[in-house]
Amino acid sequence: MKFIEFNQELINIDNKNIVGIDEVGVGDYFGPLVASAVFVPLENKNTLKELGVTDSKKITDSKIKFLAPKIKKLTKHSTYCLKPSTFNSLSRFNNGNELKMFAHLGAFSNLKLDKIIDFVLIDKYSTTNSIEKYYKKFTNTEFFAKFKHFDNNVLLANKAESISIEVACASILARERFLYEMEKMNQKFNEIFPFGASNQVKEFASNLFKQRTDIEPQEVCKLTFKMNIEK
């Protein structure tokens, strides 16, 4: 197994069996980190494109909720959710890019496949050497989580969601789960937690933690964000 920088001129993925993996929640102070792994049977690729499947960042949340059930019917898929409390525990020993790989492996490990795969395809979110290092760290036999290994070569692509229907599907399913988890948090605490990590989010968080002593920051947000919030 090797990590290979994707070159569209050398590798045609349209007629290949691909598992695409993508994550959501990296840029959100509140909520979990969610990754999805998706395999699209060759005969369903065009159907998904005709439905309007594309990078989740380019479509509305209502369209996400419309597309997700259709994607699930046409694919093999698995989603892995790192809730804030778990994310914060792991972040004491792992950086943000490492936790992306952790979530990717979690999603891939739960994926049930009945076809031989040609490639795994993910976004090139760091250098090739660094991504390989993250992978080796979490697939080490001594690591507590026994993740399934990538048996196939892994393609690393810039803006993979725009290149691969599998990664686009993964981004939508991950976003759907992220929205679900945020809605659950809203209901549990009777708040409307904002997305992103803007100054408005910082102001919301500052007011929230001053007024709601029953809400522990590590249970609802990613403490790795340098928000400098006074309580």
Predicted region positions:
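Acidic (Asp/Glu) carboxylate-rich active-site/surface patches
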Residues: M1-V19, E23-V34, V38-K231
